[in-house]
A protein has these predicted regions:
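Structural signal for the C-terminal ends of transmembrane alpha-helices
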Residues: 43-48, 119-123
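Solvent-exposed, amphipathic alpha-helical segments
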Residues: 40-43, 147
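N-terminal transmembrane-helix/juxtamembrane module of multi-pass inner/ER membrane proteins
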Residues: 1-39, 76-92, 98
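Soluble non-cytosolic domains of exported or imported proteins
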Residues: 21, 25-35, 50-51, 59-67, ...
């Protein structure tokens, strides 16, 4: 711990080493867990209620993909969390395995994946709905707020949450899109594995 020097951190992230808030940390947990309701709320739509199996499979695949990417990256990078640099934080909080899991933010990536998935599926099933702008506004705001709270809580640097947001949003948007049937009937599917993600192109 004594060898850690904030001066070695890039200018964008450096100021985050002074952040540490249990309240912000707990609030980010609430947003993460609350985002799990977003895919479930899709069932309120009549069109989607008639096709729950497909939506459930797509959401499960989205969760597996974002989980795999996030976990593999954390273990590969092992970036030290901002609070570890903070001298006011107790030493015992800085020595756990979680202290080196900063890059990238799992809370942000999972939240973005959930909300963007819900918005993407809603837009597909209700392409002419007047609620689409509202749905997309909520979908983009919740993970942004989650990322802010993770930085405020000292758990992540700004670049951690920006990356997490991008990965989660891309996953939540792309997985349903890849499964959409085109006019040709051809489909492209993501197949998550333990240590990789594959693509299957099916021609009908």
């Amino acid at each position: 711990l004594a060898s850690l020097d904030p001066a070695n951190i890039n200018a964008l992230d450096r100021g985050s080493v002074h952040n540490y808030s249990g309240k912000a940390d707990r609030a980010s947990d609430v947003l993460l867990h609350g985002s799990l309701a977003a895919p479930a709320l899709l069932l309120a739509g009549r069109n989607i209620r008639s096709d729950p199996g497909t939506v459930a499979i797509l959401w499960g695949e989205t969760a597996l993909v974002v989980s795999g990417i996030t976990t593999l990256t954390k273990f590969a990078v092992r970036r030290t969390r901002p609070f570890v640099y903070n001298p006011s934080v107790p030493a015992d909080a800085k020595t756990g395995i979680d202290a080196k899991a900063s890059f990238f933010s799992g809370h942000t990536s999972f939240t973005a994946a959930n909300t963007f998935f819900a918005a993407r599926v809603f837009a597909d099933y209700f392409p002419h709905s007047k609620w689409k702008p509202v749905v997309w506004s909520v979908a983009t705001t919740i993970p942004a707020a989650t990322g802010y709270l993770r930085v405020k809580g000292g758990k992540h640097f700004p670049t951690d949450v920006i990356t997490g947001y991008a990965v989660g949003a891309l996953t939540g948007f792309v997985v349903p899109e890849l499964h959409k049937a085109h006019r040709t009937g051809n489909t492209l599917s993501l197949v998550p594995g333990w240590d990789s993600i594959g693509l299957i192109w099916e021609i009908r």
